[in-house]
């Protein structure tokens, strides 16, 4: 499958979750076994020789791609979650959204010091969530090797916010 084939499987939902937003629905992509496998295969091919120590998935759609990729790479999976979801001691960070603030957490013992961490999320929009996730990873002793996204909304310029970090996206809109 080509990248264009994969992109054609992403459904556009107008006015969700609020009016004016064009939501990129990945359920049609992950519901197609061949396409879902292709996404994981392409990510695995990119990272298999990059000495990644852990894969971080961002709640919640990031988990869909981070878990099978961590398995394929033979490394651990570290979740970054919304507040109150992790049972042990955590680092927390609050970050700005267009319409308020949000918080994320990671376990304090998530990594060995200096671990090379690959961060996976489904979509790069403005970059606010992933920038906060990078700060959490560094608080926990990890080093961000690369940020990987299945989808990038280029018109929102999230990559600019992350310009000091390597960014990869499989599909751009």
Curated annotation (Swiss-Prot):
It is found in: Cytoplasm. It is an enzyme of class 2 (transferase). It catalyses: AMP + diphosphate = 5-phospho-alpha-D-ribose 1-diphosphate + adenine. Its EC number is 2.4.2.7. One of its GO terms (molecular function) is AMP binding. GO terms for biological process: adenine salvage; AMP salvage; purine ribonucleoside salvage. Homodimer. HAMAP family: Aden_phosphoribosyltr (MF_00004). This is Adenine phosphoribosyltransferase. The lineage of its organism: Bacteria, Bacillati, Chloroflexota, Chloroflexia, Chloroflexales.
């Amino acid at each position: 499958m080509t990248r264009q084939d994969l992109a054609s499987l992403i459904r556009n939902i107008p006015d969700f979750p609020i009016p004016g937003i064009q939501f990129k629905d990945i359920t049609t992509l992950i519901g197609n076994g061949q396409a879902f496998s292709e996404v994981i295969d392409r990510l695995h091919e990119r990272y298999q020789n990059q000495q990644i120590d852990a894969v971080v998935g961002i709640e919640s759609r990031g988990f869909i791609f981070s878990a099978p990729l961590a398995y394929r790479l033979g490394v651990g999976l570290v979740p970054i979650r919304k507040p109150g979801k992790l049972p042990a001691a955590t680092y927390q960070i609050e970050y700005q959204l267009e319409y308020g603030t949000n918080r994320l957490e990671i376990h304090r013992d998530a990594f060995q010091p200096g671990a090379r961490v690959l961060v996976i999320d489904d979509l790069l929009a403005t970059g606010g969530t992933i920038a906060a996730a990078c700060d959490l990873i560094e608080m926990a002793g990890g080093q961000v090797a690369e940020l990987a996204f299945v989808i990038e909304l280029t018109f929102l310029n999230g990559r600019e916010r992350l310009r000091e970090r390597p960014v990869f996206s499989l599909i751009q809109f």
